[in-house]
Regions:
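A short alpha/beta connector and helix-capping loop motif
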Residues: 56, 94-133
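Hydrophobic packing residues within well-ordered alpha-helices of enzyme cores
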Residues: 46, 73, 95-99, 171
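Short aromatic/hydrophobic-glycine micro-motifs
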Residues: 30-31, 38, 104, 156-158
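Rossmann-like AdoMet/SAM-dependent catalytic core
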Residues: 1-10, 18, 24, 29, ...
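Active-site glycine- and acidic-residue-rich loops that bind
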Residues: 85-95
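Short alpha-helical
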Residues: 41, 90-91, 166
């Protein structure tokens, strides 16, 4: 549909790469990609759970900021990006704000459903932001869906929906117009996409207390 035969990707925020958004792509399509995370001993951990021969994968142990993101990409990326995925539980909005317009065909970004449907909010652009340290609940992180959609519109993308967990939003470059490529797509009211059942809140002592809203 989007003329992608063997997806090239960049994913920021992958942990040890066992649950990353591009993991299936790497295993299935033998692609070229870059994964970035601040996880200690990242390359060792990733190599322990993938077949490294399956693709041309660059593994970067870096803490991404709005100041270094473009430099890191320009230094390491020598290919056209089909899929860009971002999930760092923090200053995601400010990273997107610094990215060049239309950086990829498909863009996947985490959002915080706890912020609700009407608020256009994000966390402050703090160096070394850590959701666990910023607020004991662990719930103040990332960006609201409304704010994410609006910044992505400025970056020349349109919204096509989310995953069923209601924490990852999907966007398509306007180079692939919705009336041509997704003409039968139905976009629900934004309230639908923030109705999440994920319960990862903590009490002041750091224990999970499973608040739903």
């Amino acid at each position: 549909m989007l003329k992608i035969e063997r997806p090239n990707f960049i994913e920021i925020g992958v942990g040890d790469y066992t649950e990353a958004n591009t993991r299936f792509i790497y295993d299935r399509f033998y692609p070229k990609g870059i994964i970035i995370d601040s996880e200690k001993d990242l390359k060792k951990k990733v190599l322990s759970n993938i077949n490294y021969w399956k693709g041309d994968l660059i593994i970067l142990e870096e803490r991404i900021s709005s100041e270094n993101i473009n430099n890191i990409i320009s230094k390491n990326c020598d290919f056209s990006i089909d899929i860009f995925s971002l999930d760092i539980d923090g200053i995601d909005y400010w990273i997107i704000n610094k990215l060049k317009t239309n950086i990829s065909k498909i863009f996947v970004a985490e959002y915080n459903a706890v912020f609700g449907a009407s608020l256009e909010v994000t966390t402050p652009n703090l160096k070394n932001f850590d959701r666990k340290e910023y607020h004991y609940s662990h719930l103040c992180f990332g960006v609201s869906l409304k704010a994410l959609i609006n910044i992505m519109v400025k970056k020349n993308y349109y919204f096509i929906g989310t995953n069923s967990a209601r924490n990852n939003a999907f966007f398509i470059s306007n180079d692939y117009p919705i009336d041509k490529y997704f003409k039968n797509l139905k976009i629900e009211d934004i309230n639908y996409y923030v109705d999440s059942n994920i319960r990862e809140s903590r009490d002041i002592e750091g224990n999970l207390n499973y608040l739903s809203k």
